[in-house]
Amino acid sequence: MTKGILGRKIGMTQVFAENGDLIPVTVIEATPNVVLQKKTIEKDGYEAIQLGFEDISEKRANKPQIGHAAKANTAPKRFIREIRGANIDEYEVGQEVKVDIFAEGDIVDVTGISKGKGFQGAIKRHGQSRGPMAHGSRYHRRPGSMGAIAPNRVFKSKELPGRMGGQRVTIQNLKIVKVDPERNLLLIKGNVPGPRKGLVIVKSAVKAKAK
């Protein structure tokens, strides 16, 4: 069954494996999450657990948020997300979910909001090739042809300049290198989406290969 937790991306560092290999890892701080609600097929049409992460003061929360958190005997939360596919019988409302639900060697999917890059050209945004940079060339970094004359329009899939980044991105099949329950840290091999301090969701991998 699926396991999941919410956390914040702290940054990247390096650790050594037992065989001496240097492994680049991303550090994720996941302070204890609280189960705010259990979604059931009978009542909601699907099964999921609703997790709350990071307390906020009641002054910054509205009455529905305060009341919803009170049912779980906890403070209002800054972030609330659902984890589908979890075995809801293993969870109770008000229960804390900590990093020790994962173990070293587990394969996970990490979801976050990618870094916003603003308005970018086709070369940076789509990886297109640039034109000749010589003095005689009049074509350097433009998108190129918009298409043939006949359709009298630009096709929908044409790669053009525009807003880049700031989108929900999931990187699959990342390996957990280390779990530190005392400091609420997960060390995950490779990079994960988003800026430092950005919210990330760590879940059991959907497409993990069987051992």
UniProtKB/Swiss-Prot annotation:
InterPro entries from the UniProt entry: Ribosomal_uL3 (IPR000597), Ribosomal_uL3_bac/org-type (IPR019927), Ribosomal_uL3_CS (IPR019926), Transl_B-barrel_sf (IPR009000)
GO BP: any one term: translation
UniProt key word Transmembrane helix: no
Cellular component terms (Gene Ontology): cytosolic large ribosomal subunit
Record-level Gene Ontology MF annotations: rRNA binding; structural constituent of ribosome
Database matches in SUPFAM superfamilies: Translation proteins (SSF50447)
Region (Disordered): 122-147
Keywords, sorted A to Z: Ribonucleoprotein, Ribosomal protein, RNA-binding, rRNA-binding
One Pfam family matching this protein: Ribosomal_L3
Residues in coiled coil: none
Record keyword Amino-acid biosynthesis present: no
Recorded family membership: Belongs to the universal ribosomal protein uL3 family.
Protein role: One of the primary rRNA binding proteins, it binds directly near the 3'-end of the 23S rRNA, where it nucleates assembly of the 50S subunit.
Subunit structure: Part of the 50S ribosomal subunit. Forms a cluster with proteins L14 and L19.
Protein name, UniProt field: Large ribosomal subunit protein uL3
Protein source organism: Geobacillus sp. (strain WCH70)
Lineage: Bacteria, Bacillati, Bacillota, Bacilli, Bacillales
Name of the coding gene: rplC
